[in-house]
């Protein structure tokens, strides 16, 4: 990949990465960071709901680079430094709880007037690969990013060589729902939009969804402040949630996936219980499932070396 073509400059947040704003068409721009040797196998990271690219821990990204990958990470639409979707609010507010309940029992939410769905976000990702002239990549998605990755692998099998899915779901009906303690994080918000309240809320959320006894509050606070300074856009997180709910079950896409697939899930994940990861493993032929003891819905520091090794070994086994 010719980095000079895209005006990449040293990242202001991670010293071993380079950053650029890339126009992918349809008046959309994505903030993209790359790191490692461009001649090495490309690995694309897709992050989850409302989470900027900074939420990929530096040690995780560096571990993948050291394992021999050229790593690409980006802000999804509506978050971070990527384009925001400024669609007018619908006349009647969307009932997110109603959408959650409908998806849980397999009812469609496609009639709800959401700003976009996961299929639109898949096209963002595919167009980014086109723009970067990356014909075939190892795709690793976390949470909502894992849902995007599943659809991408099924719709564009020639673009995805290998698939890594972390603490994600295929939203199959009647899977165990989000636990009440973690559900609060999806239905609440900071007291105000002042930075101290936003940071306190972010720490509160991670204490509930993260790995028990392994949440580094100081690091979480640093990341929340960084996210706030880059771009504070809570509507983007809301529209990400609605994109998931409007899309619904993606089991039919899992059944089309033929690429080697590894699924990694935390034993203590209350936001997306591990049964969701097992459901993906059951739906994707010849996939492998790994349950990480004591891990929640995050990439906590103690688990990063294990996860990096699992992802790297999986690629090498099928290269």
What are these regions (language model features)?
Residues 3-29:
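N-terminal cap/lid segment of alpha/beta-hydrolase-fold proteins
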Residues 26-108:
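Conserved HGGG/HGGXW glycine-rich cap/lid loop of the alpha/beta-hydrolase fold
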Residues 106-107, 119-137:
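Conserved acidic catalytic loop of the alpha/beta-hydrolase fold
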Residues 135-174:
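Conserved hydrolase catalytic core segment
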Residues 178-252, 259:
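Alpha/beta-hydrolase
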Residues 257, 263-265, 269:
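Short beta-strand/loop motif that positions the catalytic acidic residue
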Residues 270-276:
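Conserved alpha/beta-hydrolase "acid-adjacent" motif
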Residues 287-319:
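Catalytic active-site module of serine/aspartate enzymes centered on a nucleophile-bearing elbow/loop
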């Amino acid at each position: 990949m010719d980095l000079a073509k895209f005006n990449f400059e040293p990242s202001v947040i991670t010293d071993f990465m380079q950053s650029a704003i890339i126009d992918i068409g349809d008046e959309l721009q994505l903030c993209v960071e790359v790191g490692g040797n461009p001649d090495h196998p490309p690995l694309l990271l897709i992050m989850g709901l409302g989470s900027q690219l900074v939420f990929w821990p530096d040690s995780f990204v560096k571990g993948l680079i050291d394992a021999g990958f050229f790593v690409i990470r980006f802000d999804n639409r509506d978050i971070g430094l990527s384009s925001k979707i400024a669609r007018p609010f619908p006349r009647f507010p969307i009932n997110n709880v109603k959408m959650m309940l409908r998806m849980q029992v397999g009812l469609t939410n496609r009639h709800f007037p959401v700003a976009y769905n996961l299929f639109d976000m898949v096209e963002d990702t595919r167009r980014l690969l086109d723009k970067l002239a990356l014909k075939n990549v190892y795709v690793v998605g976390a949470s909502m990013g894992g849902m995007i990755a599943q659809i991408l692998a099924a719709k564009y099998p020639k673009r995805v060589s290998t698939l890594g899915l972390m603490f994600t779901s295929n939203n199959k009906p009647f899977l165990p729902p989000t636990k009440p303690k973690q559900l609060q994080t999806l239905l609440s918000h900071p007291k105000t939009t002042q930075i101290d309240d936003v940071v306190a809320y972010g720490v509160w959320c991670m204490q509930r969804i993260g790995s028990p006894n392994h949440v580094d509050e100081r690091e979480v606070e640093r990341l929340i402040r960084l996210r706030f300074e880059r771009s504070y856009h809570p509507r983007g997180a809301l529209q990400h949630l609605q994109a998931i709910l409007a899309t619904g079950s993606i089991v039919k896409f899992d059944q089309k996936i033929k690429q080697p697939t590894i699924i990694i899930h935390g034993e203590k994940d209350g936001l997306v219980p591990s049964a969701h990861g097992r459901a993906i493993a059951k739906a994707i032929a010849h996939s492998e499932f790994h349950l990480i003891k004591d891990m929640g819905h995050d990439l906590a520091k103690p688990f990063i070396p294990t996860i990096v090794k699992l992802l790297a070994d999986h690629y090498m086994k099928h290269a």
